[in-house]
């Protein structure tokens, strides 16, 4: 059995090679993305694993079919970068890694919240200037006194809710699919609007859909409790970014922790040090004084990276051997 891996970073290569040695499977790695040009490198291979970031070119699906390759294993939970209908038309199974480390994202969410409510960024800036004074700009809030709204109560949302509950927060939530596990931790509300209206902190953990694209916009921000904090560790497209910046400037929101940006594809995960960022909206977001922006790094732990690599490769092997897998999404 031979597998081709695309978009492989150095640290992932080490893990993939160990997995291959442990399982007696031949693999070929490339840092290059999967494109109509590079897909030709998969000729003669049995399966593909890929860490796709932006939309996959539609021309790739029929090319894979011609090669006899029947799947693409994505190294993430989200698969919005794939045309699932076109994949199905070409007998290509797309798989994901649905649960690689919910705790990694949950812990990161709470880390950023604590930084925001205790003004850690400002304190560090002051200290570098040898300003050691106390005053209102750095006076913080107690997390346990806050009401938290979790929007999206799947694995990650639930893990996040549990941590906030452990701090003593009142936790409410909304999801179109309510779970018994979440009901033990939070109080479900019947709508997003009802969940957010009294929340000091709103934390987003839902998958991207056509229905929730730009759901968090100027109209919804007006329904927030004045001075609330917004956290987005989900997908960038659920927020209308300019409306978020306007809400921060107007004082409707007091802060935001943003790990994903709708148009991050050209920038993440790349080093742009010393280069010009031409996306003016992205520049405004990352430089806003009330925003802590992180480059889609909430998931990024040893455990998560290992689980993503191995999860994608295991799914590839399972499809080759059996024709299907439990992690298929089409």
From Swiss-Prot:
A GO MF term: NAD binding
InterPro entries (UniProt xref): D-isomer_2_OHA_DH_cat_dom, D-isomer_DH_CS, D-isomer_DH_CS1, D-isomer_DH_NAD-bd, NAD(P)-bd_dom_sf
Active site (catalytic residues): 235, 264, 296
Keyword Signal carried by entry: no
PROSITE patterns: D_2_HYDROXYACID_DH_1 (PS00065), D_2_HYDROXYACID_DH_3 (PS00671)
Signal peptide: none
Transmembrane segments: none
Coiled coil: none
Positions with a binding annotation for NAD(+): 155-156, 175, 206-207, 212, 233-235, 259
Reactions mediated catalytically: (R)-lactate + NAD(+) = pyruvate + NADH + H(+)
Protein EC: 1.1.1.28
Domain of life according to the entry: Bacteria
Keyword terms of this UniProt record: NAD, Oxidoreductase
Pfam families named among the record's database cross-references: 2-Hacid_dh, 2-Hacid_dh_C
Protein family (similarity comment): Belongs to the D-isomer specific 2-hydroxyacid dehydrogenase family.
Protein name: D-lactate dehydrogenase
The species this protein was found in: Streptococcus pyogenes serotype M1
């Amino acid at each position: 059995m031979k597998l081709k891996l695309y978009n492989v970073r150095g640290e992932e290569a080490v893990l993939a090679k160990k997995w291959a040695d442990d399982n007696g499977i031949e693999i070929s790695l490339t840092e290059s993305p999967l494109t109509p040009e590079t897909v030709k490198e998969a000729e003669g291979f049995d399966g593909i694993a890929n860490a796709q970031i932006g939309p996959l070119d539609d021309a790739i699906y029929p090319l894979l079919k011609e090669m006899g390759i029947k799947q693409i294993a994505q190294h993430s939970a989200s698969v919005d970068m794939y045309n699932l209908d076109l994949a199905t038309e070409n007998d290509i199974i797309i798989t994901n890694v649905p649960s690689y480390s919910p705790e990694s994202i949950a812990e990161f969410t709470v880390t950023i919240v604590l930084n925001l409510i205790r003004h850690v960024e400002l304190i560090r800036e002051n200290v570098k200037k040898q300003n050691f004074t106390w005053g209102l700009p750095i006076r913080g809030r107690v997390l346990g006194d806050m009401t938290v709204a979790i929007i999206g109560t799947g694995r990650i949302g639930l893990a996040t809710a549990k941590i906030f509950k452990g701090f003593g927060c009142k936790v409410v939530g909304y999801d179109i699919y309510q779970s018994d596990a979440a009901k033990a931790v939070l109080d479900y509300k019947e709508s997003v609007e009802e969940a957010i209206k009294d929340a000091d902190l709103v934390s987003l953990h839902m998958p991207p859909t056509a229905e929730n694209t730009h759901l968090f916009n100027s109209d919804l921000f007006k329904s927030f409790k004045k001075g609330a904090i917004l956290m987005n560790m989900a997908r960038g497209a659920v927020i209308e970014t300019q409306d978020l910046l306007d809400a921060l400037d107007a004082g409707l929101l007091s802060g935001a922790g943003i790990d994903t940006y709708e148009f991050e594809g050209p920038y993440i995960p790349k080093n742009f040090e010393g280069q010009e960022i031409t996306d003016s909206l992205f520049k405004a977001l990352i430089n806003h004084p009330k925003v802590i922006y992180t480059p889609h790094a909430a998931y990024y732990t040893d455990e998560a990276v290992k689980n993503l690599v191995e999860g994608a490769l295991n799914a590839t092997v399972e499809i080759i051997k059996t024709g299907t897998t439990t992690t298929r999404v089409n």
